[in-house]
A protein has these predicted regions:
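Juxtamembrane helix-loop-helix connectors linking adjacent transmembrane helices
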Residues: 1-36, 167-172
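Hydrophobic alpha-helical transmembrane segments
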Residues: 27-31, 61-66, 81-82, 105-106, ...
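Transmembrane alpha-helical segments in integral membrane proteins
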Residues: 28-53, 150-162
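Short alpha-helical transmembrane interface motifs in multi-pass membrane proteins
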Residues: 32-33, 75-76, 136, 140-142
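Transmembrane alpha-helix interface/packing and boundary motifs in multi-pass membrane proteins
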Residues: 33-39, 69-77
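Membrane-interface helix/loop boundary segments of multi-pass membrane proteins
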Residues: 40-66, 93-100
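C-terminal membrane module of polytopic membrane proteins
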Residues: 109-172
């Protein structure tokens, strides 16, 4: 019952953030819903929590999945818990393989920005439908995930091509 109430509140907040009354609200939303969370959450979860757990457990996989679990839990949207946790793990491994937070920040930004653009294109009804469609993924979720995956793969390849991979990494 409490989880459902959190979902309802999250839907209301999300819908209000993604409904625009003036032109300046769209760039403000990109800043507050896409850029700031991407930077702050990646620094917190992949920059602080993940390395701490790796140090405590001496297991990078445990660190990635623990940070991903906490990343998903902190959003308090339980119907989308598993997809968000998998996204968090993907971002965690992106940090490990690139040896940088920036590809994960970029992928996180594009994931969030994709949802903002979809809301701007399809309107508040789309937001309400998407928020109430949980736990199944809608077609747009797959689209956003595919774009995010493409951007993530591109960034990893770019980082690898520029030679910034750590020498001790098993890819070498």
């Amino acid at each position: 019952a409490n989880a459902d109430r959190f979902e309802e509140l999250a839907a209301e907040v999300t819908q209000s953030m993604l409904t625009y009354d003036s032109a300046w609200q769209f760039p403000a939303t990109l800043l507050t819903v896409a850029l700031l969370p991407a930077v702050c959450e990646e620094f917190a979860f992949r920059g602080v929590i993940q390395p701490l757990v790796a140090k405590w457990t001496n297991n990078i996989h445990a660190a990635v999945w623990m940070a991903a679990f906490l990343f998903s839990a902190i959003h308090l949207q339980f119907h989308g818990f598993l997809p968000r946790m998998v996204l968090g793990a993907g971002l965690g491994y992106l940090v490990i393989y690139s040896n940088s937070l920036w590809p994960a920040i970029a992928a996180h930004f594009f994931n969030n920005a994709g949802a903002i653009f979809m809301a701007a294109i399809y309107g508040p009804e789309w937001v309400a439908q998407e928020m109430n469609a949980a736990p199944e993924w809608a077609a747009s979720d797959y689209g956003i995930a595919a774009v995010s995956l493409f951007v993530g793969i591109y960034l990893v390849r770019w980082v690898r091509k520029t030679g910034t991979w750590p020498k001790h990494h098993p890819v070498h």
